[in-house]
Regions:
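Active-site residues of response regulator receiver
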Residues: 18, 63, 93
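Active-site beta3 strand of CheY-like receiver
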Residues: 55-61
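Conserved Asp/Asn-Gly motif in the active-site loop of CheY-like receiver
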Residues: 42-46, 119
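Receiver (REC) domain active-site loop signature in two-component systems and cognate sites
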Residues: 66
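Two-component/phosphorelay signaling modules centered on CheY-like receiver
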Residues: 21-40
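A short, hydrophobic beta-strand element within the central beta-sheet of small alpha/beta folds
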Residues: 86-96
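Non-catalytic signal-transmission and effector/linker regions of two-component phosphorelay proteins
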Residues: 1-15, 118-136
Length: 136
């Protein structure tokens, strides 16, 4: 588990779970540079539940396909936990395109989006997905 940015009561907490450490590090830097988010990276999906319990995220960005554990299995563990069941989860994957995501695709009730390749796309995704910002 790698936590970046300074904790603040006004900063939303985002957990990024992906076996690709390059993606989690880049995404963490993008979000951290806004000074609006406290970000935690987890590259071992088998530790995602424990990391989420310790970090108390406001949002979880979760890779859908990982070698050690399927993203849907990880999401099921998180949503069945009494402390975490209300935390929004967004699946991020390289398996769909922006066009395919426009129809509001969901897996097990969770939004599915293509992995953001640009910092502005990532920031927009986080802002749309956070309960405080999305109107959810």
């Amino acid at each position: 588990m790698n936590t970046t940015a300074e904790s603040s009561n006004s900063n939303s907490r985002v957990l990024i779970v992906d076996d690709n450490s390059e993606f989690t590090h880049r995404a963490s830097e993008f979000l951290q540079n806004t000074h609006r988010y406290v970000v935690c990276e987890e590259n071992d999906p088998r530790r995602a539940l424990e990391t989420a319990r310790n970090f108390h995220p406001d949002l979880i960005l979760l890779d859908l396909i990982m070698p050690e554990a399927d993203g849907t299995e990880v999401a099921a563990q998180i949503t069945s936990d009494w402390m975490l069941h209300s935390v929004p989860i967004v699946f991020v994957t390289a398996l769909i395109t922006r066009e395919e995501a426009r129809d509001g695709r969901r897996i097990e009730g969770h939004r599915v989006v293509p992995k953001p390749g640009h910092s502005l796309d990532l920031i927009k995704l986080v802002e749309e997905s956070l309960p405080c910002c999305s109107g959810a």
